[in-house]
Amino acid sequence: MKTQRLGLVVWMVTGRLALAQAPAPVDRDLLAKIRSEAMDRSDVAPVFDMLTVTIGPRLTASPAHKRAAEWVRDRLASYGLENSHLEPWHFGRGWTLEKLTVEMIEPRYLPLIGYADGWSASTSGEIVATPVFIGGKSPQDIAALSTQLKGAIAMTDPIMTNFVRKDRPQPSEPEYVPLSAAYATGIGQPRPNTPAPAQRMAQALREAGAGVILKPSRGEHGTVFVTGRDLGPGAVPSITLSAEQYNMIAQMLQHNIPVKMRVNVQTRFYDSDGGNAYNVIAELPGTDPGVRDETVMIGGHLDSWHTGVG
């Protein structure tokens, strides 16, 4: 008898749970409309092309970023979203690269793979000179070399030795490390904020009057990873080279092989918007009176680094 009662109780509980968890009816007509919009009338490709191909890199607070923000604002309004507008927030000076030349011209000609660091200053015109390799030297050593460094092309980092931790596995392989895990282990991470020794090095080069700084990329597997920051008036212009080419030039200098380079960096800073960057905000009001006052936020990055299109 007890067994029968227990069975009845279990049946009643599981039966109620099954009824409580019954799925809501599926509106297949609505799903078909959503699929049709995505597959037959998608606007993703034109939007993608406008932002990445036509406008291109969108460094925060740059004119290109402002242009992209205005275009997105108008595009969202054309879709019927309400209150589409730009919302300013203070960032600092905007910046764009206007010209970059970085070449080895002796002992043979070679166009080099390099990018001006974000917010780099401009060089005083074109610099044609033998680079000075100071990788591993202290700020005190640099001060002693001030005569050699005045107006010079300064290679500031030691020769790079870490290019690949292991052969890069493909996503289909069991040992593939997803991007999120790679960042957790430090692989390919952006450089942290400039540490004190690097700040002292930059100050020593500024005081020595160096013409331009060359440093190797920290990217692995042949990538060139470039960031940057606004170091204020009087900062020495700076360029990140591919690590392989940086090493090649440094090794030739160490073996007393004459090397000559041609470098020219021309950039422009912008304060026209008072140091503001912009978020793009638009609203899609709900229709259900029970929840229409609630807010669901959907967002994404509009900006990118100056060396990529995002």
What is each of the regions a protein language model found here?
Residues 28-31, 44-48, 52, 56, ...:
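Extracytoplasmic/secreted envelope proteins and their assembly/folding machinery
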Residues 29-30, 114, 119-144, 228-309:
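Soluble metallo-hydrolase cores and metallopeptidase-like ectodomains found primarily
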Residues 38, 52-59, 72, 76-83, ...:
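Sec/Tat-exported extracytoplasmic proteins
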